[in-house]
Amino acid sequence: MIVQPSAVAKGWPIATTLLPASCGPADPKPEPKPKQRRLCRKVFPLRARCGALAHCPIPGKNEIFTNVNHSHISIPSPRLLLVEDDPRLREDLDAHFRRRGFRVTVCGDGSHGLEAAGREAFDLVLLDIMLPGLDGLALLESLRREQATPVMLMSALGAEQDRISGFTRGADDYLPKPFSLAELDARTDALLRRVRLDRLPLAQRRDTRLVFDDQAQDVLHQGLPAGLTPSEYRLLATLREHAGEALSKPFLYRSVLHRSYTRLDRGLDVHVCNLRRKLAVVAVRHLQIQAVRGQGYLLVETEHP
Protein backbone atom coordinates (compact mmCIF):
# COMPACT_ATOMS: atom_id res chain seq x y z
CA MET A 1 0.00 0.00 0.00
CA ILE A 2 1.24 3.47 -0.92
CA VAL A 3 0.85 6.11 1.81
CA GLN A 4 1.70 9.78 1.37
CA PRO A 5 3.53 11.07 4.51
CA SER A 6 1.81 14.43 4.28
CA ALA A 7 -1.59 12.76 4.45
CA VAL A 8 -0.66 10.92 7.67
CA ALA A 9 0.67 14.08 9.27
CA LYS A 10 -2.58 15.91 8.60
CA GLY A 11 -4.73 13.13 9.99
CA TRP A 12 -6.50 12.44 6.70
CA PRO A 13 -8.20 9.03 6.34
CA ILE A 14 -6.11 6.54 4.44
CA ALA A 15 -7.59 4.38 1.67
CA THR A 16 -7.30 0.69 2.36
CA THR A 17 -7.22 -0.43 -1.28
CA LEU A 18 -3.94 -2.12 -2.03
CA LEU A 19 -2.35 -1.18 -5.35
CA PRO A 20 0.92 -2.22 -6.85
CA ALA A 21 3.60 0.35 -6.25
CA SER A 22 4.08 0.81 -9.99
CA CYS A 23 0.53 1.87 -10.89
CA GLY A 24 -2.11 4.38 -9.88
CA PRO A 25 -5.88 4.35 -10.27
CA ALA A 26 -6.89 3.30 -13.77
CA ASP A 27 -8.80 5.87 -15.82
CA PRO A 28 -11.60 4.55 -17.99
CA LYS A 29 -10.53 4.35 -21.62
CA PRO A 30 -12.49 6.63 -23.96
CA GLU A 31 -14.45 4.86 -26.63
CA PRO A 32 -12.73 5.09 -30.00
CA LYS A 33 -14.34 7.53 -32.44
CA PRO A 34 -15.75 5.95 -35.57
CA LYS A 35 -13.61 6.57 -38.60
CA GLN A 36 -15.18 8.79 -41.23
CA ARG A 37 -14.60 8.45 -44.93
CA ARG A 38 -13.32 11.60 -46.55
CA LEU A 39 -13.21 12.48 -50.20
CA CYS A 40 -9.49 11.93 -50.50
CA ARG A 41 -7.85 9.45 -52.80
CA LYS A 42 -5.43 8.22 -50.11
CA VAL A 43 -8.03 6.83 -47.71
CA PHE A 44 -10.23 4.89 -50.11
CA PRO A 45 -9.70 1.12 -50.32
CA LEU A 46 -8.74 0.23 -53.84
CA ARG A 47 -10.92 -1.86 -56.09
CA ALA A 48 -10.07 -3.45 -59.40
CA ARG A 49 -9.26 -0.71 -61.88
CA CYS A 50 -11.68 -0.10 -64.71
CA GLY A 51 -10.72 -0.58 -68.32
CA ALA A 52 -9.58 2.35 -70.37
CA LEU A 53 -12.43 4.68 -71.36
CA ALA A 54 -15.01 2.21 -69.99
CA HIS A 55 -17.65 3.59 -67.67
CA CYS A 56 -17.37 2.21 -64.18
CA PRO A 57 -20.52 0.48 -62.90
CA ILE A 58 -22.72 2.72 -60.80
CA PRO A 59 -22.97 1.31 -57.27
CA GLY A 60 -26.42 0.33 -56.10
CA LYS A 61 -26.08 2.53 -53.04
CA ASN A 62 -23.87 5.56 -52.76
CA GLU A 63 -21.71 4.91 -49.71
CA ILE A 64 -19.86 8.21 -49.78
CA PHE A 65 -22.27 10.98 -50.71
CA THR A 66 -25.44 11.98 -48.91
CA ASN A 67 -28.42 13.75 -50.42
CA VAL A 68 -28.06 17.54 -50.63
CA ASN A 69 -30.06 20.28 -52.30
CA HIS A 70 -28.50 21.11 -55.65
CA SER A 71 -28.68 24.42 -57.45
CA HIS A 72 -30.15 24.60 -60.92
CA ILE A 73 -27.88 23.42 -63.74
CA SER A 74 -27.75 26.19 -66.33
CA ILE A 75 -26.96 23.84 -69.26
CA PRO A 76 -29.33 20.94 -70.06
CA SER A 77 -27.53 17.58 -69.70
CA PRO A 78 -24.01 19.06 -69.49
CA ARG A 79 -21.19 16.88 -70.81
CA LEU A 80 -18.56 16.14 -68.16
CA LEU A 81 -15.15 14.53 -68.62
CA LEU A 82 -14.01 13.01 -65.31
CA VAL A 83 -10.34 11.97 -65.12
CA GLU A 84 -9.57 10.29 -61.77
CA ASP A 85 -7.34 7.28 -61.09
CA ASP A 86 -8.92 6.25 -57.77
CA PRO A 87 -11.63 3.70 -58.68
CA ARG A 88 -13.77 4.32 -55.60
CA LEU A 89 -13.84 8.08 -55.95
CA ARG A 90 -14.30 7.81 -59.71
CA GLU A 91 -17.33 5.55 -59.34
CA ASP A 92 -19.01 7.73 -56.73
CA LEU A 93 -18.44 10.96 -58.65
CA ASP A 94 -19.72 9.27 -61.81
CA ALA A 95 -22.88 8.11 -60.02
CA HIS A 96 -23.43 11.49 -58.38
CA PHE A 97 -23.19 13.54 -61.57
CA ARG A 98 -25.34 11.10 -63.53
CA ARG A 99 -28.08 11.50 -60.93
CA ARG A 100 -27.85 15.24 -61.46
CA GLY A 101 -28.43 14.81 -65.19
CA PHE A 102 -24.85 15.06 -66.47
CA ARG A 103 -23.57 12.98 -69.36
CA VAL A 104 -20.33 11.64 -67.92
CA THR A 105 -17.26 10.14 -69.59
CA VAL A 106 -14.80 8.66 -67.09
CA CYS A 107 -11.11 7.91 -67.55
CA GLY A 108 -8.57 6.41 -65.17
CA ASP A 109 -5.39 8.02 -66.51
CA GLY A 110 -4.21 11.13 -68.33
CA SER A 111 -3.48 9.54 -71.69
CA HIS A 112 -7.02 8.23 -72.12
CA GLY A 113 -8.39 11.50 -70.78
CA LEU A 114 -6.55 13.41 -73.51
CA GLU A 115 -7.79 10.92 -76.09
CA ALA A 116 -11.40 11.38 -74.95
CA ALA A 117 -11.10 15.18 -74.99
CA GLY A 118 -9.88 15.03 -78.59
CA ARG A 119 -12.81 12.86 -79.65
CA GLU A 120 -15.71 14.71 -78.03
CA ALA A 121 -16.60 18.26 -76.99
CA PHE A 122 -17.25 18.68 -73.27
CA ASP A 123 -18.82 21.44 -71.20
CA LEU A 124 -16.56 20.80 -68.19
CA VAL A 125 -13.48 18.75 -67.29
CA LEU A 126 -12.96 17.50 -63.72
CA LEU A 127 -9.29 16.56 -63.54
CA ASP A 128 -7.15 14.94 -60.85
CA ILE A 129 -3.51 16.08 -60.79
CA MET A 130 -1.79 12.92 -59.52
CA LEU A 131 -2.46 10.56 -62.42
CA PRO A 132 -0.41 7.60 -63.65
CA GLY A 133 1.56 8.27 -66.80
CA LEU A 134 0.50 11.65 -68.15
CA ASP A 135 -0.25 13.71 -65.03
CA GLY A 136 -3.07 16.20 -64.70
CA LEU A 137 -0.97 19.35 -65.24
CA ALA A 138 0.56 17.96 -68.44
CA LEU A 139 -2.91 16.99 -69.64
CA LEU A 140 -4.16 20.49 -68.83
CA GLU A 141 -1.40 22.08 -70.91
CA SER A 142 -2.28 19.84 -73.85
CA LEU A 143 -5.96 20.75 -73.58
CA ARG A 144 -5.21 24.46 -73.50
CA ARG A 145 -3.35 24.27 -76.82
CA GLU A 146 -6.52 23.08 -78.54
CA GLN A 147 -9.58 24.24 -76.59
CA ALA A 148 -10.95 26.54 -73.90
CA THR A 149 -13.19 24.04 -72.07
CA PRO A 150 -13.40 24.94 -68.35
CA VAL A 151 -11.16 22.68 -66.25
CA MET A 152 -11.43 22.15 -62.50
CA LEU A 153 -8.39 20.54 -60.87
CA MET A 154 -8.76 18.17 -57.91
CA SER A 155 -5.78 17.35 -55.73
CA ALA A 156 -4.62 16.58 -52.22
CA LEU A 157 -1.76 19.00 -52.98
CA GLY A 158 -3.36 22.09 -51.50
CA ALA A 159 -0.30 24.29 -50.96
CA GLU A 160 -0.36 27.80 -52.40
CA GLN A 161 2.38 27.05 -54.93
CA ASP A 162 0.46 24.00 -56.20
CA ARG A 163 -2.66 26.10 -56.72
CA ILE A 164 -0.68 28.83 -58.48
CA SER A 165 0.93 26.23 -60.74
CA GLY A 166 -2.50 24.93 -61.71
CA PHE A 167 -3.91 28.36 -62.49
CA THR A 168 -0.87 29.47 -64.48
CA ARG A 169 -1.22 26.40 -66.68
CA GLY A 170 -4.80 27.23 -67.51
CA ALA A 171 -7.06 25.82 -64.77
CA ASP A 172 -10.36 27.61 -64.19
CA ASP A 173 -10.78 26.34 -60.63
CA TYR A 174 -8.89 24.29 -58.04
CA LEU A 175 -10.64 22.02 -55.54
CA PRO A 176 -8.37 20.66 -52.76
CA LYS A 177 -9.00 17.18 -51.38
CA PRO A 178 -10.76 16.27 -49.18
CA PHE A 179 -13.77 18.29 -50.33
CA SER A 180 -17.47 18.38 -49.55
CA LEU A 181 -20.13 17.49 -52.07
CA ALA A 182 -21.86 20.84 -51.53
CA GLU A 183 -18.70 22.75 -52.48
CA LEU A 184 -18.12 20.53 -55.50
CA ASP A 185 -21.64 21.22 -56.78
CA ALA A 186 -21.36 24.96 -56.14
CA ARG A 187 -18.09 25.19 -58.05
CA THR A 188 -19.23 23.08 -61.02
CA ASP A 189 -22.49 25.04 -61.27
CA ALA A 190 -20.57 28.33 -61.23
CA LEU A 191 -18.34 27.17 -64.10
CA LEU A 192 -21.35 25.99 -66.11
CA ARG A 193 -23.08 29.34 -65.65
CA ARG A 194 -20.02 31.02 -67.15
CA VAL A 195 -20.11 28.57 -70.06
CA ARG A 196 -23.76 29.34 -70.74
CA LEU A 197 -23.14 33.09 -70.51
CA ASP A 198 -20.21 32.89 -72.92
CA ARG A 199 -22.31 30.94 -75.43
CA LEU A 200 -25.18 33.41 -75.52
CA PRO A 201 -25.18 35.32 -78.83
CA LEU A 202 -24.97 39.07 -78.59
CA ALA A 203 -28.57 39.43 -79.81
CA GLN A 204 -29.85 37.58 -76.75
CA ARG A 205 -28.02 39.96 -74.44
CA ARG A 206 -29.58 43.08 -75.85
CA ASP A 207 -31.50 45.29 -73.51
CA THR A 208 -34.01 47.70 -75.00
CA ARG A 209 -31.83 50.48 -73.62
CA LEU A 210 -28.53 48.74 -72.87
CA VAL A 211 -26.39 46.76 -75.33
CA PHE A 212 -23.77 44.22 -74.18
CA ASP A 213 -20.74 44.10 -76.50
CA ASP A 214 -18.84 40.86 -75.83
CA GLN A 215 -15.95 41.73 -78.11
CA ALA A 216 -15.30 45.12 -76.54
CA GLN A 217 -16.18 43.87 -73.03
CA ASP A 218 -18.33 46.95 -72.56
CA VAL A 219 -21.95 48.12 -72.57
CA LEU A 220 -23.51 50.92 -74.58
CA HIS A 221 -26.43 53.07 -73.53
CA GLN A 222 -27.96 55.29 -76.19
CA GLY A 223 -24.80 54.77 -78.23
CA LEU A 224 -22.48 55.83 -75.41
CA PRO A 225 -19.90 53.30 -74.10
CA ALA A 226 -19.68 52.98 -70.33
CA GLY A 227 -15.93 52.25 -70.37
CA LEU A 228 -16.10 49.11 -68.23
CA THR A 229 -13.14 46.95 -67.33
CA PRO A 230 -13.36 43.21 -68.16
CA SER A 231 -14.12 42.42 -64.50
CA GLU A 232 -16.84 45.07 -64.35
CA TYR A 233 -18.33 43.76 -67.58
CA ARG A 234 -18.40 40.18 -66.27
CA LEU A 235 -19.97 41.42 -63.04
CA LEU A 236 -22.77 43.30 -64.83
CA ALA A 237 -23.38 40.44 -67.29
CA THR A 238 -23.59 37.91 -64.44
CA LEU A 239 -25.98 40.09 -62.44
CA ARG A 240 -28.08 40.70 -65.57
CA GLU A 241 -28.23 36.96 -66.26
CA HIS A 242 -29.64 36.44 -62.75
CA ALA A 243 -31.69 39.66 -62.51
CA GLY A 244 -33.80 39.76 -59.36
CA GLU A 245 -31.77 36.96 -57.74
CA ALA A 246 -29.46 37.66 -54.80
CA LEU A 247 -26.01 36.33 -55.71
CA SER A 248 -23.65 35.50 -52.86
CA LYS A 249 -20.21 37.02 -52.61
CA PRO A 250 -18.44 33.63 -52.78
CA PHE A 251 -20.27 32.88 -56.04
CA LEU A 252 -19.48 36.31 -57.53
CA TYR A 253 -15.82 36.04 -56.54
CA ARG A 254 -15.52 32.69 -58.32
CA SER A 255 -17.59 33.66 -61.36
CA VAL A 256 -16.37 37.21 -61.88
CA LEU A 257 -13.00 37.64 -60.17
CA HIS A 258 -11.92 33.98 -60.56
CA ARG A 259 -10.65 33.66 -57.01
CA SER A 260 -11.91 32.50 -53.64
CA TYR A 261 -13.73 34.88 -51.30
CA THR A 262 -12.30 35.95 -47.96
CA ARG A 263 -14.05 38.23 -45.47
CA LEU A 264 -11.30 40.86 -45.60
CA ASP A 265 -11.29 41.04 -49.41
CA ARG A 266 -13.12 44.18 -50.58
CA GLY A 267 -12.29 43.76 -54.26
CA LEU A 268 -15.87 42.97 -55.27
CA ASP A 269 -17.24 45.98 -53.37
CA VAL A 270 -14.83 48.25 -55.23
CA HIS A 271 -15.94 46.84 -58.59
CA VAL A 272 -19.61 47.34 -57.65
CA CYS A 273 -18.92 50.96 -56.66
CA ASN A 274 -17.10 51.67 -59.93
CA LEU A 275 -19.79 49.93 -61.97
CA ARG A 276 -22.55 52.02 -60.38
CA ARG A 277 -20.61 55.20 -61.08
CA LYS A 278 -19.92 54.36 -64.74
CA LEU A 279 -23.53 53.38 -65.41
CA ALA A 280 -24.68 56.66 -63.89
CA VAL A 281 -22.33 58.60 -66.17
CA VAL A 282 -24.06 57.19 -69.28
CA ALA A 283 -27.49 57.76 -67.66
CA VAL A 284 -28.44 54.13 -67.01
CA ARG A 285 -31.22 54.54 -64.46
CA HIS A 286 -33.40 51.50 -65.10
CA LEU A 287 -30.87 49.06 -63.60
CA GLN A 288 -29.96 49.21 -59.92
CA ILE A 289 -27.32 47.10 -58.18
CA GLN A 290 -28.53 46.57 -54.63
CA ALA A 291 -26.60 45.13 -51.70
CA VAL A 292 -28.35 42.35 -49.79
CA ARG A 293 -27.21 42.32 -46.17
CA GLY A 294 -25.51 39.07 -45.24
CA GLN A 295 -25.81 37.67 -48.78
CA GLY A 296 -24.33 39.65 -51.65
CA TYR A 297 -25.74 41.68 -54.54
CA LEU A 298 -28.70 41.61 -56.89
CA LEU A 299 -29.69 43.55 -60.00
CA VAL A 300 -33.13 45.16 -60.01
CA GLU A 301 -34.76 46.46 -63.20
CA THR A 302 -37.10 49.40 -62.71
CA GLU A 303 -39.53 51.24 -64.97
CA HIS A 304 -37.36 54.35 -64.91
CA PRO A 305 -36.91 55.74 -68.45
Swiss-Prot record:
Q: Which SMART domains match?
A: REC (SM00448), Trans_reg_C (SM00862)
Tell me what organism the protein belongs to. Answer: Pseudomonas aeruginosa (strain ATCC 15692 / DSM 22644 / CIP 104116 / JCM 14847 / LMG 12228 / 1C / PRS 101 / PAO1)
What domain of life does the UniProt record list for this protein's source? Bacteria
The protein's name is Transcriptional activator protein PfeR
List the record's Gene Ontology CC terms alphabetically. Answer: cytosol; protein-DNA complex
The lineage is: Bacteria, Pseudomonadati, Pseudomonadota, Gammaproteobacteria, Pseudomonadales
What biological processes does GO assign it?
phosphorelay signal transduction system; regulation of DNA-templated transcription
User: Could you tell me where this protein is found in the cell?
Assistant: Cytoplasm
Stated role = Member of the two-component regulatory system PfeR/PfeS. Activates expression of the ferric enterobactin receptor.
4-aspartylphosphate: which positions carry it?
128
